[in-house]
Amino acid sequence: MSPDKLVYMANQIGKFFAGQGEDKAVPLIADHLVKFWDPRMRKAIIVHLADGGGGLDAAVQKAVASLSA
């Protein structure tokens, strides 16, 4: 799957949880990615973040960073 598609999908998840406030949204986004994304998709978005994370919203960047921690 292309990085652009993954960014779009991850940001959509981020928008869904945005109303919770960033402190609550970040772990919810990360949990969603772990539960519902294929491991290859998670790896690709982690690599995308390592390459600069272009296009990822701030809360999504933090959530993805927590996956690789």
Language-model-detected regions and their locations in the chain:
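N-terminal acidic leader/helix
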Residues: 1-22
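Residue-level recognition of alpha-helical structural elements
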Residues: 2, 22-26, 52, 56
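Residue-level detector of well-ordered alpha-helical segments, enriched
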Residues: 5, 9, 25-29, 41, ...
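N-terminal glycine-rich anion-binding loops that anchor highly charged ligand groups
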Residues: 36-39
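Short, charged early-sequence alpha-helical segments and their helix-coil boundaries
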Residues: 41-66
